[in-house]
Amino acid sequence: VLEYAGYYTDDEHPFEAFLKKISGYLKEDGKLLIAIENKFGLKYWAGSREDHTGKFFDGLEGYIDTDSKVRTFSKEALKKIITDAGYGKAEFYYPFPDYKFPVQIFSDEYLPREDDLNIGLDTFDNTRMMLFNENRVYANLLKEKKFEFFANSFFIEVTK
């Protein structure tokens, strides 16, 4: 629900404020688990609609043409939000093809090999275009070590 924080507070930085509030409910050794879409996920470049607004390329373009307060973020933006909210450590995992229908989950310690990602990449929750072959692009992203940037979503384990 992090992406909806803009609806729950008038704070200038609603996502950080939301995470700060949640930290008060965590034990000192507790963990916060976040599942969220990556605004730069490959599926959005390939023709999937933004999951929350239903518009093509909405997150990629910075949500400029929407009244929605929903926002998704890149890995770097999420790291900053988490740090600014006062948390210490964030471990990123990469559910594939995304967190709603994961077939595999990767980590920074175990990133996929090309044959790990050779599956059908249908979108079950929305209509989409198929602008290119995602499996072929993933193969190139893996060679260039860019999988994390284009992962469709994140599962994040956050500690104080």
Question: Model-derived features: where do they sit?
Answer:
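A short SAM/SAH-binding and catalytic strip from SAM-dependent methyltransferases
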Residues: 1-13
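Conserved catalytic loop of SAM-dependent methyltransferase domains
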Residues: 89-127
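Conserved class I S-adenosyl-L-methionine
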Residues: 31-58
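Acidic, His- and aromatic-enriched active-site or binding-groove loops in soluble protein domains
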Residues: 55-67, 114-123
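Short alpha-helix
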Residues: 67-94
